[in-house]
Design a protein with these regions (language model features):
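Catalytic strand-loop segment that frames the active site of acyl-thioester-processing enzymes
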Residues: 1-28, 43
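Short beta-strand edge segments in extracellular beta-sheet folds
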Residues: 9-11, 95, 107-111
């Protein structure tokens, strides 16, 4: 069951050839990871509801199951989110139409924006 979903439109800059992760004009894994992470980031922001805080990506595991054409719409669905203290764990799926193209797990950590940047 979907807790959250977002649709992403693919274009040439999302291709493996353009990114440099492959030679073909298909959706690149790095671009797909970006879509998955963006969906998790947006849902985390809704859950936190504090302008002083944000989340940062800490871990991503993905199974890119099927290639997809550039121009296809990618629907990212978050099926589960758990929260322990500052840590948020997401289970995500990506689809082209109704066909599953990827499954992933992603961890984000809640941080104070100012404190986080001061430590860099």
């Amino acid at each position: 069951m979907a807790i959250y979903s977002k649709v992403y439109e693919t274009s040439t800059e999302h291709s493996a050839k353009y990114i440099g992760s492959g030679e073909l004009e298909v959706l690149s894994t790095p671009s797909l990871v970006g879509f998955l992470e963006n969906a998790a980031c947006l849902l985390a922001k809704e859950k936190i509801q504090n302008d002083l805080l944000t989340t940062v990506g800490a871990k991503m595991a993905i199974d890119h199951l099927k290639a997809s054409k550039i121009g296809n719409s990618i629907t990212v669905i978050i099926t589960e989110v758990t929260n322990q203290g500052r840590k948020y764990d997401f289970q995500l799926e990506a689809f082209v139409d109704k066909e599953l193209i990827a499954k992933a797990s992603h961890t984000r950590v809640c941080v104070n924006k100012e404190t986080f940047l001061e430590k860099l």
